[in-house]
């Protein structure tokens, strides 16, 4: 690699490039071959961490367009489109998504797609495939598959490892199986099953360092402690949930609540989202993001409106307020996955 910046040692030049925001990296790499090599080097990302210039971006995938992910840069209020996820499954949905080891992971899921000519189902309901997006090389790569194919399951990161539990397998049968993945060694290992499965989708939340598996429609929560799974009766509100700074927030009946173990308090009205379905509610930094979704037909209007809107609830202020962020530039409609990624 030739000198990055004339007159400067490469070690110093790398630290200069490390301060450039991620969205400009595609422009940096066309300057010259040595800059391209630097942009795709792990040394640059190590320097970003040392200089505290790493960026936390929001990753979003929607039903439309197919298998496309976008990154949101909150500092500059702009969206970046990633290369298309190269899965053979059309309209991949019902998957798990997390980030760890500075990579975006998309796990399992399947497709309800139907061939428009024959009417036959065009995909598998549940797969065991695992994809990782590496922002250093800006490419997707397949990783070791899960032991059990699954869709609509709980998926979390604990101590840098990915835990999956519950959901439905290929025959649409609910399962209680759980497993954990080591991204450094690309290995899956089975862990004790959940105490029960349920004929509904489940989601996973990390609260107080512990995984909580929540089934839609149930008041009980399964919590993974150092002694194994425990069943807790929490009577939490039903609705979209997210965690911000260790606290659980729920949108229910047109309101945002801060939910403690046995009590809750109203944070702010969310009546503007009553007609919207299929959106994501995501804790990001000190804020709650409500992203995308669709507005269904009403009255004589039979149209379905696919949304690309992004609404942000700022919690750090004495009085929480709703604000608008830049709309997604490619993705729109039902949100299939949403997670934070540190680059």
Regions found by a protein language model. Give the residues of each.
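Kelch-like beta-propeller repeat domains
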Residues: 1-343
């Amino acid at each position: 690699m030739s000198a990055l910046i004339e007159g400067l040692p490469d070690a110093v030049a790398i630290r200069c490039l490390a301060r450039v925001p991620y969205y400009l990296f595609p422009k940096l790499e066309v300057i010259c071959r040595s800059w391209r090599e630097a942009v795709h080097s792990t040394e640059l990302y190590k320097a970003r961490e040392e200089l505290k210039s790493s960026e936390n971006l929001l990753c979003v995938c929607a039903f439309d367009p197919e298998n496309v992910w976008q990154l949101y840069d909150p500092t500059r209020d702009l969206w970046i489109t990633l290369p298309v996820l190269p899965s053979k499954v059309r309209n991949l949905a019902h998957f798990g998504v997390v980030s760890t080891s500075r990579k975006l992971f998309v796990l399992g899921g399947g497709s309800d797609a139907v061939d428009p000519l024959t009417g036959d189902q065009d995909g598998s309901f549940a797969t065991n495939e695992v994809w990782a997006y590496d922002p250093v090389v800006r490419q997707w790569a397949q990783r070791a598959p899960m032991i059990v194919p699954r869709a609509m399951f709980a998926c979390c990161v604990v101590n840098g490892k990915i835990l999956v539990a519950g959901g439905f397998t290929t025959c649409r049968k609910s399962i209680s199986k759980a497993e954990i993945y080591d991204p450094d060694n690309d290995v899956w290992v089975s862990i004790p099953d959940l105490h029960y499965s349920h004929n509904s989708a489940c989601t996973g939340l990390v609260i107080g360092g512990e995984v909580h598996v929540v089934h839609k429609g149930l008041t009980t929560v399964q919590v993974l402690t150092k002694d194994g799974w425990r069943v807790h009766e929490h009577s939490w509100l039903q609705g979209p949930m997210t965690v911000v700074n260790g606290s659980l927030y729920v949108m229910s009946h047109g309101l945002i609540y801060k939910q403690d173990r046995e009590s809750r308090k109203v944070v702010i009205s969310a009546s503007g989202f009553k007609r919207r379905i299929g959106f994501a509610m995501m804790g990001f930094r000190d804020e709650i993001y409500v992203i995308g979704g669709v507005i269904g037909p009403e009255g004589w209007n039979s149209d379905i409106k696919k949304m690309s809107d992004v609404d942000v609830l700022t919690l750090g202020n004495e009085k929480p307020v709703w604000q608008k962020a830049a709309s997604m530039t490619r993705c729109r409609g039902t949100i299939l996955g949403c997670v934070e990624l540190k680059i």
